[in-house]
Amino acid sequence: MATASTSSIPAIERCAGDPAAFVRDHWAKAPLLRRGAGPDGFDDLLSLDDVDRILSTTSPRTPAFRLVKDGKPLPPSAYTRSGRMGSVPLSDLADPGRIFELFHDGATIVLQSLQRSWAPLTAFARELELFLTHPVQVNAYLTPPAARGLGVHHDTHDVFVLQVHGRKLWQVWDAAVPFPLGHQTKLPPGAEAPTGPPLVEAELAPGDCLYVPRG
C-alpha cells in the first residue's frame, strides 16, 4: 500500500526553491529550471516499481491511463482487456502484457490524475494546491529510451516537470498562445513549428525540476 511522502521539505520548495522568489519571478511569467531540486530524487512520490505495481496489480481502467506513440494516441483496444466486477462486465481494464509490449515498441505510458489514487501524490498535490490556491492534477509519463512521447504542443495550464528516473531532453519556446484559456487547445496557424532558439533546452536528470507557464 502506498504511504505519504517521507520528505520534510514543503512541496513548493521541492519544485521551485524559494517560494517568494518563484512567485515574483516565474509564476505565470517565465520557465524555471532547477538542477537537483530533489537531492534524493523524487522516488518517494512515484518509483518505477510503483508504476509496475499500479499497472500489474490494481487493474486501472481508462481514462486513468493511456498510451501514446510519436505524439499520437493509441486506441484503448490495443492495451485493454475485458473482465468482470461481480456481475458487471467491464471492457476497459489495463492489460499489463499488452501495455509493456507496446512500451518496449516505443509507446509512452501515461498515468492520469494520480493525485486521486496514489497516496504520496495525493499529499504532494494537496500541498501545492494550498500554496498556489489552484487545483493540481498529477500525470506520470513513462517513455522508453530513444522514443518521443508527445510532439511540439502548448498547454492551457502551468506545468511542473519532476524527473524521477532516466534522462529526457526538453525544449521550451516562448508562448505560442499567451495565457490560453481551457478551450484554446489548438496552436494558431504558423505556430506548429517553433522558430528561433528555445528559451530552455536542457536534459533533465533524476531530481531535476522544470516549471513551464501555460502557453
Q: Language-model features: where?
A:
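Active-site region of the double-stranded beta-helix
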Residues: A2-D25, D40-D208
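Non-catalytic, conserved peripheral segments adjacent to functional cores
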Residues: A28-A30
